Amino acid sequence: MAQDKFKRTKLHVNVGTIGHVDHGKTTLTAALTKVGAERFGGEFKAYDAIDAAPEEKARGITISTAHVEYETEVRHYAHVDCPGHADYVKNMITGAAQMDGAILVCSAADGPMPQTREHILLARQVGVPYIVVFLNKADMVDDAELLELVEMEVRELLSKYDFPGDDTPIVRGSALKALEGDQSEIGVPAIIRLAEALDTHIPNPERAIDRPFLMPVEDVFSISGRGTVVTGRVECGVIKVGDEVEIVGIRPTSKTIVTGVEMFRKLLDQGQAGDNAGLLLRGTKRDEVERGQVLAKPGSIKAHKEFEAEVYVLSKEEGGRHTPFFNGYTPQFYMRTTDITGKVCLPEGVEMVMPGDNVKVTVSLINPVAMGEGQRFAIREGGRTVGAGVVSKVIG
């Protein structure tokens, strides 16, 4: 019990492995748990246990993901590893496993491969903020110049997708050797260096409570003699009685004052991230607010109609469409608490999108919705999920 309490004092950070198939992501994940367990306690997870990743559902999509934990001197890491390429794509787009940073695993023997590139691009598109590189299988390369070359290639690739390639930590090692307990430079010490790189290169994540206030509107009702109450779950920030908020989305933005905060029918001084709250709004009529809008700190979020997004389209087996869709496809986009119709514009040279594909699209909604980059959404047809996406850029 005492140990459990002690654990909470360490800062919690979410990471994951990305990179090409067979470059050693799962072996590295196992090595991190082993070295972590030996140094700071915790549980060693063997390769087979991680590889047999259980299936989960996120936004109606089934994804195989393995979750492991390990500790460093200053942090507690929750780490995700996916068995297949398709699982990575789905994971990153749905945000099923939010990452504060990623470990890019690249084989020193092969150098960057197609999925290396695709995972870096996806990391950029979906807003993974930091990448640390592990150059794996370094024991298979005798030529020091070749190692330098591969390292340069990886740095160039990172820079190409707007990561700081020149300043990114690249650790050379062998995950397999580390698992075997090898104490040479590329064995266990390499894993320790990688853990240190995670500690120093990935900054402390910003907590939801420290961000500007935002609450998606789920329900609106009027209480006679008191006014209009809006209910929802506070997504981020803190709201106090007397605070000014903006009502954003669907209609022109308006301002009001919060005159009461309630939770479970009790009056409070404030509500914060994670709370299911009811907010009493001054001088706002019942028909001036609707589900799908958000209440937010003034100036912190704007409503947009047009945006670029990275999208994953469910396969037929996943319960998605049985046929491809084309330019001008008009499904519903489910963002936070609202379904809103939008038109899809495909990139030049892409004629159609097959179920199971991932693609970058431009979307035009019929009404503006409060959103920013990194906003996740589901794509639905008649209430059935056919895809998932994340806003990579707002246009207008």
Swiss-Prot record:
Catalytic activity: GTP + H2O = GDP + phosphate + H(+)
Entries under InterPro entries matching the protein: EF-Tu_GTP-bd, EF-Tu_GTPase, EFTu-like_2, EFTU_2, G_TR_CS, P-loop_NTPase, Small_GTP-bd, T_Tr_GTP-bd_dom
Pfam family, one: GTP_EFTU_D3
UniProt-annotated binding residues for Mg(2+): T26
Binding locations of GTP: 19-26, 81-85, 136-139
Transcription regulation is among the record's keywords: no
GO cellular component: cytosol
GO molecular function, one term: GTP binding
Domain of life: Bacteria
SUPFAM superfamilies: EF-Tu/eEF-1alpha/eIF2-gamma C-terminal domain, P-loop containing nucleoside triphosphate hydrolases, Translation proteins
Location(s) in or outside the cell: Cytoplasm
Spans annotated as G4: 136-139
Region (G5): 174-176
Subunit record text: Monomer.
Function: GTP hydrolase that promotes the GTP-dependent binding of aminoacyl-tRNA to the A-site of ribosomes during protein biosynthesis.
Family: Belongs to the TRAFAC class translation factor GTPase superfamily. Classic translation factor GTPase family. EF-Tu/EF-1A subfamily.
Annotated protein name in UniProt: Elongation factor Tu
Organism: Xylella fastidiosa (strain 9a5c)
